[in-house]
């Protein structure tokens, strides 16, 4: 170790001898002798930069310091921190070492690296003599260190009274006490008074006050009172208040000292401080004359009569801010209360007494005009009384603080955090208009201080209590008192810190209690029990406020306005989309506030849904869940050209559960209540409303139902007499109705409606609100939902249909609709309902003209009619456009516009159409199922007792294939509006209305109706593509055919594929009829065969046959049966014009039973059908819907390719039928349902059958016009392959045969289903037979259903004929009014048989009757299905 290091060590160890030895000069002679003349380095520094002099100064050893200085040691050498020996000498505090160093010439004002000069260190450590010596050597006491503190600041902070006196006596005192610029903004800004107050140095505070420091000097944290209050320095607070500090001054966070105490301190000392501050800040005390509580306003003060309230200030709106001290608990509650609530206890003396007649008036003198002294006086009484008077000597000081009171009221913004609850601070006056959301409190803050002070004691009662909840203080006390009632007040902090008030606590769950720290099971159980006993209203607004700020204020969470706005929730409509996760993400973390917000959001969403359902049925549209099957068309009215159809515009899916009460209400005025019930119940809860609708025997009642369903579906023209439901209006408009809820709202609603979707609405009750001619109404998206609703409305007469519709999901666009598994399964059942409703409506209301119906359809947003090849009105294409919205409705599936042709058929078609979308078709497994949802199918089977087990997957696959095929035909022609695919799609949707212009409309309709009863008729009857006029000419009344097809199509549309849905249904469940027909064989009665093959087709035969008695009679019926089957498939694909069969609804029901494909024999399986077969069952319904469109078969040649299962159907759509049918049993997107059936039945067979059976558009489809539609057996879509075989077997005879072919695959299920399905089919049949003409009656819809249920061909054959009669009988039994309506329709159809297109209108009416019957059946089936699903 070198000598330098030895020297440093010796000095450090205060070894003077060694240091002297090392520092001695060697003798010259010796040095020379030794050769060491080297001198030691006295300034050597160790690694820390310390030299020997540093150590000597730090140790205070004067001998070593002198020795080193003599050795020429540098006096101002710096260590690594910039500290010089003088710094260490000052720090050490010894006078002699300081003298030595100062004498050596050390600089006194050179700072260290931290900015400290020696005086800082001496003052901080209280070295009076050293400080005095430094001052004598001209040390500057105003130099600030890096933290902005002067030596005086440090002395005050550390309580060095002597040094403070020394510094204050220096000539720099005034400069030291002057406020520095930037103190209020500099985070480090401070003052000697703040530091002394913060640390409780009372003597120093007195010295500073005597020296003349500004007592109200402010920094960023506020005044010294803020610091003392926050740090709990009670005596300092008292001293400052006695010295006249302004207790109203607010810091940069808009907090007063009292606010800070409320918010941040909980110690015992804080209670006394609160009292002191209350007294100092209050200018008046009042006694409450009555109870007051406003739990909606976070800033309000809950008081009881007799409470003593210390008035703190007045809000600009006239309310007073007061504080109530609870002597028992020591808690303070701060908040606003009406100025009229209290009476002054003491009238203050002074300038203010005169102006203080009453508490409200007293504030006047406090106004800015009042001198500070006056204000001081106001506060003084409290101070004098409570503070035992340092008031006397404070009067002067207070004069300075008097204005502070005003300033506090005026100047500073009050943050929510200031109050105990953060809302207290918000409520405090003087807040600048910091937060509009804060409402009244915000207003108060915005008021200027003077004005505020003047009003402090509120001249008039508050104009409004804008904050929504009691202030935190009052809420905390209320919670504490409540907990005290059962000795668990120890949890009060848990509740209050989490932001819970009593109204929110009353909605807490045990999980919520655990989340806030109530972890002891015994305590949690006790609190839960007490919560259950709380009877506190939710205090949530009962109406939708104008904006977010008002809403937040109403629920007492105005402090979150800025947070919500900053995060994109500035619109009151956006807030309904917020979730718990969103609240957490944007920083609203208090569990109580989160819960209150979510409760309020839920209530707001309910209000919005109610509003939309009331004005637009909007909630329905919104609610549409993911299920795409039931899609209402919102696109332009069917009047639009084919282009509209192609656009597949605004069809939103109808999810069964989505039909909420609101939706139901929207769908049918009378059924609104029922709808709500339905929503609550499962899919079928609305059964009662449906029954009611069905029970309406009078035509007027029917018309009413029809109007509602038409409204929903936008069916074609309704009789002017028949009112159109609101939904229909929207649908007819096909454009967003003015009332259409905004997309945002829709989305929010959508979330809510998803749950509802599972519950079928009670559409059964028609919305009588709208006149039949409501077509001019523009349905908002509600129409989409409304359309299913319309089927419901139509089904309304048939209670079951109504209940099942649950089209609410429909309202939402397919995308909007959440696809919930539950929703999807339920949707099949609901769909059934939806379909049913439209048909009964049509049948019921004479107003909808068979042919003209389509024109009115535009009025109803949902244009259910496919654009007829020639007859179909332009708006039918709209249906196509609507198809876009519903995913299930594939191109092959006719849009609602098409279905719209006949009012009843249109609605029917609409529902089904949703299901049978090209998309659905293409997405066989997931999408199709969801799309098909078996809603309509499931619903229908329910009507007749337990629905048969769900159809086998094979039928589903077939249906899917059909759907897939349909789209291409739809595109090709669809009545010139859309390609065949588009037509088919419409045909599916508009089962009845689509084929209005196709040939053989009456018989096609009958066949479609039959298929409809089975569930596949619609598709079978699918009208031929535009390119195939031949089938069209065959149909006498395109309108009628369209009507029938519409109904048929509806059934089909619901199929899992979308269009094949109905067919599937027929194949799996209702397919029983198709299978029965096939089994029956070509030789068997066509009617029976049709019913067996496709309820839709058979119904169509029935309706058309009756209407067309002259045209073809039974033969046509037969041909139609097979044609209907194929058409149905086709209808799904192309949605032909003939798709208008209303029977499709019934058929769907039948198919539902037949959905037994899984071999679930009992009717009850349909619920399963809805899921497994569900697709098939649903498809059935789509088939019904598409049954209506079957007349479109010609237009939907593409439908043929898509429907693998629908192979026969594709031919049906083709005018030639045989040539047109897609031979392959394509497994549409729903291979599960369609493919299995297809495989079982064999795709080859369907292909062959298809040859015999012209496409739905083929003559048989058009057969309604007189030409048997071989492709009619569209119903067999599920067993597409078999159906084609049937078609090949023979157009007319083959109708039965094709059914049998599919039956092989499905036969076991069908057979199983037969028993269960028969009753439903019969039930549906009765409704259907009346609707068709006499011949149609021969092939009663019921029989088709029975046939469908009796999957076996032969039994079905026998059932077909007799079931038609029995169906009619059953219809009469079910509802005399339905029977009468059906008879009237039949007569009309008969009259129109020779007329050609006329039969279509007659058929529409008959279809409406059939729909009613179907509705009845659906009611039964729905009930059964509900039971099964449950």
Swiss-Prot record:
- The gene name on file is Caskin1
Subcellular localization(s) per the UniProt record: Cytoplasm
- Name all SAM domain ranges: 474-537, 543-607
Q: Where are the ANK repeats?
A: 48-77, 81-110, 114-143, 147-176, 188-217, 220-249
Q: Name positions with the PTM Phosphotyrosine.
A: 253
One GO cellular component term: postsynapse
Q: Which Gene3D superfamilies match?
A: Ankyrin repeat-containing domain, SH3 Domains, Transcription Factor, Ets-1
Task: Give the source species.
Answer: Rattus norvegicus
Q: What is this protein called?
A: Caskin-1
